[in-house]
Amino acid sequence: MAKYRCGNCWREFDDEQLRALPGVRCPYCGYKIIYMVRKPTVKVVKAI
């Protein structure tokens, strides 16, 4: 399941809630700009 964040109210929701409305809009405020939240990953870099 992908997580999304609204560009206006900054609430997070999943793709099931996104499919509930026609088009791509925030289910809470109806804003059209939505960001996909990335999982926090740690990048390990070998020291030289």
Swiss-Prot record:
Main location: cytoplasm
GO cellular component, one term: cytoplasm
GO BP terms, alphabetized: DNA-templated transcription
Swiss-Prot/TrEMBL cofactor(s): Zn(2+)
Catalytic reaction list: RNA(n) + a ribonucleoside 5'-triphosphate = RNA(n+1) + diphosphate
Function: DNA-dependent RNA polymerase (RNAP) catalyzes the transcription of DNA into RNA using the four ribonucleoside triphosphates as substrates.
Record's protein name: DNA-directed RNA polymerase subunit Rpo12
Species name: Sulfurisphaera tokodaii (strain DSM 16993 / JCM 10545 / NBRC 100140 / 7)
Gene that this polypeptide is encoded by: rpo12
